[in-house]
Structures are given as C-alpha cells and as structure tokens.
Amino acid sequence: MKTLKIPVLITLLLTGCGSNQVTSTSSNYSSSKNSSSTTSSNQIISSSIELEKVDLELPVFIGTQSGFQIDRNIYGTFIEHIDTCIYNGIWSEMIMDRKFHDPVATGVSQWSKNGDVENNQEVYKSAPYATTINKDGSITQLGIPLDENKDYDGYFYASGNGNLTISFTNADETIERKIEINSDTMTKYEYKIHSNVKNRKTKIIIKSDSNGIVVDSLSLMPSENYYGMRKDSLDLLKSLNAPFYRWPGGNFVSGYDWKDGIGDRDERQSKRNLEYCGLESDFENEDERLANDIIKIGSLGFYGAFEPNDYGLDEFIMMCRYLNAEPNIVVNSGLGNALDAQDEVEYCNTTNTEYGNKRVEKEPYNVKYWSIGNEMNGSWQLGNVPINEYIVRHNEFYSKMKEVDNTIKIIGVGDNHSNWSKDMLNNTEMDYISEHFYAERDEKDSITHIRSLQKQAEYRIDNHRKLNKPNVYMSIDEYAYMNAECSSRLKDGMGVALCLNEFIKNADVVKIGCYSSTVNATQGSLTTDKYGAHMQGNGYALKLYSDSMLDYYQPITFQRSKLKDEVFEIIGTTNIGKDKLAIAVVNSGEKKIRLTNDKFKKIESRKYVTADFLDDYDDDEYSKFRYYEENNPSSIVVEPRSITTFVIQL
C-alpha cells in the first residue's frame, strides 16, 4: 500500500519583518500515487509585509467563555462491518472467501473450478468447507489487485502428498510458486511474491499435480501491514486524529457473536451475516462469476453475504492503540444475551478469569466505554422488542457487565424523537444515552444541504434538555447524511463542521460524537481503492477541529447582514487560561474575508481545506481537495469555499 504523502515544508522569510517567520505546508492527504493535487495546492501561500488583499474586512466580537469543558470525544468516529468499511477498507486481506464459506463455484463463492475439485466438509480450520484439489484440477479467483514493485506474503493450510502450483497471472506478468505438500495433517505453508507491475485484474490459480490435496484458510496480504490492517488506511486515520472509535456496529452488532472474532484468525469460522442475510445474490452462471470484480461481490459487497471474522475485538484494540484512540465496544443486546456481554467485559478488563485467560495479551485492555445495543427502538433491528421488555433486558445487561468491572461507563440506546429515551432514562441506569440522526440531502440548494446536519443536532439536543436528566450525557454516536454516495464532498464536510459547532456549544450535555462512518460505506471520512486511501470532505472537517480546537466554548459574533447569501459561521474555543483562542470558520461563498479584533495579538497557525467547487471530492484519479497548514500567518484570512481553523494568542 502507498505511504502517506509527507507534505513539503516551505519556509518564507518576510522582508522587513525582523525575526517573524511564516511557514506553509500543503498536502492533499492521499496515499495513492495516482492522486495528484491541483497546481494551486503546491503553491506557496502568499505572505508579505503588506496585508493580503481581501473582498471583505469583517470585525468579530468575543463573548464570554462557557464554564463547561469540551470533551474531546465529540470528535470521534464509528466503524462497522458494513460495505467495505472493514474488509477492503481497513483490513488488508486480498483473497475473498479465503475460508470457503460456500462450496467452490456455488452460491456466493468467489472461486471457480476447473477439473477434479471436491468440496470437503471434514475441515481443519474454518468450517463449513475446505477444498480438495485432485490431479490436474485447479481453483481460480479473479480481481487480485497487485501493485507495482510491491512484496506480498501468502500462506495456506494443506494436507496430502504432491505439489501445488500457485500462479498469479495477468496481461503483463505471471508469478509462480511451486510448493511441495507432504503431510497427513493440515499444515501451514508460506510463500512470498514480488509484483513488478500494477494490475487490478490479476487472477490466482491453485493447481494440483496429485490426488487428494486438501486446501483451507488461504491468505495474501501486502508485506507492509499492521497486524493485518492496511498501513495506508491506518496512516490516514492517524492524521484524522479522532480520539474515540465505536465498533462493531451499527445494525451489524445485533447479529454478531464477539466470540467468533477472537483467537487464531485461521480458526475463526466464517459466518453468515445475520443482520443482512438474504441481501446477497448468487451468480447466474460461471461467466458471471468470472466477470465480477473483487470489490462488488460477496463479503465485500454492500452489507455482505457473510462475515469472515478476520477482524475482531483484538484487532480493533490494536487499531485503537496505533491511533491513540479510546475504544468503545457495542455489545449485542439484539440476539445476544447478558452473559455474553459479561464475558466480553471479562475478556477485555480482567486477569485470572475464564475469559481474561483467553485474551491474546496478559495485560487487560481496560476498555472504559461500553454501549448496550444499537438502535433497539427500531423495527429493523434484530431482537427488537417493545420498550417495556427492552428496559428489563437493558437492566440485566447493565447489572451483569457492572459485576465484572464497576468502573466502566455505559451508553444506553436512546431515541428522543419518540418517547423511547424518556422511558429508558426513567427506568434504567446508564452514564450516557445514545442518539443517532441522518440528515436529508438537498442537491438543489447547497445552503440548505450544509445546514441540515446542524438542524438535526439542534433538534436532538433540545429534546434531550427537555428530558431533564442532567447526570446522563448525550452520546451522538451516529450522524451523517442520509443515502449518501461513498465520497464526501467539500459541502458535506461543511455540514459536519456545523454539526460539530452544536456539540461544542452544548458541551454541558454532549460528551461523545461519532461520525458515521470512518472508512467508505456512508460517506466515509476516508475512502479506499485497491491501491490507496483518500481523505474526504468530512474527514478534513473532523481533522481540523480535532487538531485545533481548545477546551471551552467561546462565542464569536459578527455582523451577519454582510454575508447573507452563503453559509458563513464562526465558532471559538479557548484554553482555561483564556490567553489562547482557536476559531473554526465555514465559508461556502466566493468572498475572501479577513477577520479583525484588537485583542488578537499573534496568529500561531492557520489550517484549511478548500476546493474549486462545493461538490468536489477525492478519487483514485485526481485529488480535488487542497489542504494547507501555515504557521505565523500575517492576518486572519478566510479563503472562499473553505473550512478553516486559526489558533490565536490573546
């Protein structure tokens, strides 16, 4: 996978400014070498002793600092086993259906066969099937995206006596590895390959020269990975700087057994995805199977036919460590039960217990935040029951989980659009109550579109205040645009920024926020293709706020009548000493605007993202976003069509 581009640092010495120095950094935050920023993203930001020319000088006024500290967890995010968020997004496995969930060449299997190939249910590792390849028989899978000058690590388990030839072939090259199999029991065989060319349509062919060679649990990953995760995705997520990650769902969790996702990955059984069972489609014929692309079918298709369980609880914890983020685990209160949830807390947070001893590491994970269920108010949710029954269920989960670790923080299922939240708060115990909202898109009116998430946030927060439960805080752990395409545009990022403004303004009640979702799926903060990862509009918004915003809400006002025909919003935050101010500005219009205030002593930094059009987004061919970081700018200038943060000394 491609290494994240490191922005080039350009230093400008300002003539006549003595020791003052301005540094500017530009980047498009894309790890694909196909992506190249537009010419202007590589230009030096203009700085000189004379103030930059602008379209409008706008005085701003600083209000009174709020007394409620902003919880950084409001800049959190959410990953779910849905679409290509995990598999082909975060996870680096390149072989689909590597554990033969369906018999080869049947159902949703991504394997075709040639010659004498049998499906073997006497499996070693990953039920329900292994595959027996007899003399001159072979199995094939298409769509392996090999990259230029890249190394890959592969392995498989096999038994029998003979030779297997593994070929990777495309229009440009063929790579072969001949491996002798000489074992009556299933044994792991490893190999390495090096690709000289870039070809997304490489096919893997596994052929036997003898009868009775049984194969199971194949794998191929780039040599550069982090515990099986895509390094390009993780490095981009690290730059996102989200402090809080929610997992594994989402609707997915209500049909998920966490115990399926621990232990040796090759022994974890592939399971039918219960939440989305039936949404997969079989292939009409072999030609259709062979014609399909890796990203469009099977477990990597929308929602997915099955869950390979390669990415589980331990992998999630490893990812959070890499990202220096707080993990939030959602337990299954749909088809799951309180004892399984109790076991999960025991696995994560205890030693010398039944499940603590099953943990990969001796030291406990000490997971603090636990959610009991997801959207259990909804008829679409597996295990949905009326509120009076769910109250009993929640209380049982709460009691069993707290028996293991009384220090954990519990997030309960809420919905204050109905009476659900009221009934939950009056009859259960929890530390936070969850709220989800998905705003309608308006493709005809950009201003309405940008403000729609903000309006949803205002509505939900106002409803929560009316419930008058001051000791239970809001966890807005899913929010996004409804029915959105994968790539998030600049205007979607602006909508996320305005939503974050509401979280900041209401820091006394909103303590957790999780944008949905992090990778791909519903307008992911970043998107991936076969060769790279790309930061998108809402990702830039989250990054800017997480990187720059300070501890307390500081109201900023201005004469709004000067900016009537666009979205122009300013929000301020200060540190506890009140000597530093961080402001975020959303400007959907075409004016370049300078903000002025006599209290502004020194501008420490300006960071912003912009594009030529509000509908721009990044893809694998062209990077349309332009992201800049600038130290010690000469004035507070807001570019057209931008999301900007400034840190200012007062």
Question: Where are the regions a protein language model picked out?
Answer:
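Carbohydrate-binding surface patches
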Residues: 565-600, 647
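C-terminal beta-strand-rich structural cap/linker in extracellular carbohydrate-active enzymes
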Residues: 624-650
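Active-site groove signature of glycoside hydrolases
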Residues: 208, 248-249, 354-385, 437, ...
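An active-site-proximal structural segment forming one wall of the substrate-binding cleft
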Residues: 196, 202, 222-242, 309, ...
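C-terminal motif of bacterial Sec signal peptides marking the signal peptidase cleavage site
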Residues: 15-16
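Aromatic/acidic polysaccharide-binding cleft in carbohydrate-active enzymes
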Residues: 81-82, 472-549, 553-571
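Extracellular and organelle-lumenal recognition/adhesion modules and their flexible linkers in secreted
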Residues: 42-309, 326-328, 342, 388, ...
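Noncatalytic carbohydrate-binding groove/subsite architecture in carbohydrate-active enzymes
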Residues: 202-209, 347-348, 383-500, 532, ...
